Amino acid sequence: METHNLFLNKAGRLRSGWRLGIFVVAFAVVAKLIEMALTVIVRLVLKGSAEGFLSSSAGFIVQALVLFAAAAIVGWGCGALLEDLPARALGWANHRGWLRDLGLGSIIGAVSVLFAALLGIAGRGLHFSLNAAATPSAIGKTLLFTAPLFVLAASGEEMLFRGYPLQTFTRARLTWLGIFLTSFPFAAAHLANPNVVRGVTFANTALAGVWLAAAYLRTRSLWLPLGIHWAWNWMMGAVLGLPVSGITRLAPASLLRVQDTGPAWLTGGAYGPEGGAICTIALLIAIVLVWRTSWLKPSEEMLKFTADEIREQKSEVGG
């Protein structure tokens, strides 16, 4: 293969694999720089350890913001420098239908979790009751304040995994490779969570990555996957009282309390539904629903931003 073809595609742009490599390295550097700056700030201003702060709810929010900021800065830079794209191409533009996509995604995410919970009830593994141990005020605060927390967390992960990495492979006509290369790291990133059931957890989280990638591809924006992602977590933790990817500290006074009688292969045990078969079934159905439904479609503007770069280049030359 000629050096020209090894590095550049027929549109004269750096190939998608090299673009992804640049994004990954730049993201790691920028995220580390932001992390170092925050560590200094915590020690000087808060007079405490960075580790202690990051384990708190406030620290969780800060980590989500760092993830989002680093992925957004690097994604915008790669898009602008490597592909001549505006910041709107990353998928957060208030394009026509963005609010509808966010709302539909929120409904889809919440309903999908409820379906998984119903499977757990039908299998006699999950038993729900109202949380009588918590006051209405505490429950209300949990429902209210965890919503923006889960939105921030989902925004960071969507920006990183369904942002520039997936989008640049889509423009290179390597969509399925992009789905693979974003869904598996997305799953691997959750393996450090508490109470992981490694095989099932990885498989289910990878399936969730495919689901969220499908949501992006159907609309070519991040509003639909954001809606799905945050509502899935919020419904699971704040409403149903289930562990969210093994984490329970984020929703201290959920609306419902759950008794998990297992078996763990069905319900996920201490990791929550995402470690069990009820989640696998719900995700498979949700993927088909999002991919096959006819009422999800991208705006012309967002479709153009992820158009085939080679075909687009030929069109410009021909014009």
Predicted segments with their positions:
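Membrane-embedded alpha-helical segments of multi-pass membrane proteins
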Residues: 65-70, 140-147, 160, 203-207, ...
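N-terminal, membrane-interfacial amphipathic/helix-forming hydrophobic leader that caps
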Residues: 1-94, 98, 237-319
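Juxtamembrane helix-loop-helix connectors linking adjacent transmembrane helices
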Residues: 38-62, 83-159, 166-171, 302-306, ...
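Hydrophobic alpha-helical transmembrane segments
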Residues: 21-25, 61-62, 102-107, 143-144, ...
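Functionally important transmembrane alpha-helices
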Residues: 201-265
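Membrane-interface helix caps and helix-loop-helix hairpins in membrane proteins
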Residues: 190-199
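Small-polar-interrupted transmembrane alpha-helices in polytopic inner-membrane proteins
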Residues: 113, 150-151, 174-191, 205-209
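Membrane-interface helix/loop boundary segments of multi-pass membrane proteins
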Residues: 10, 156-181, 214-221
